[in-house]
Amino acid sequence: MLGGKQIVLTRMRTGQSGTVVQIQGGHGLVNRLSALGVRPGKRITKVSSMLMRGPVTIQVDRAQVAIGFGMANRVVVELD
């Protein structure tokens, strides 16, 4: 990557974009997120998030995907 700032998905602001660099979890989590299109190298945009550790909605390719806070907290993103 180009050395941009890396943060977890839950800390991104709404509208921010970046590239997934790592998923911090076991094979089950990696496979579940991969099935949703979230994998290292993919560019994502945070669309929204709910208060109190609610789901996080992201744009991946042309689809919007909602994932739980715990899952989103394990996705490391390099900001654009």
Placement of each model-derived feature along the sequence:
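Compact, glycine-rich, soluble single-domain proteins
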Residues: 1-80
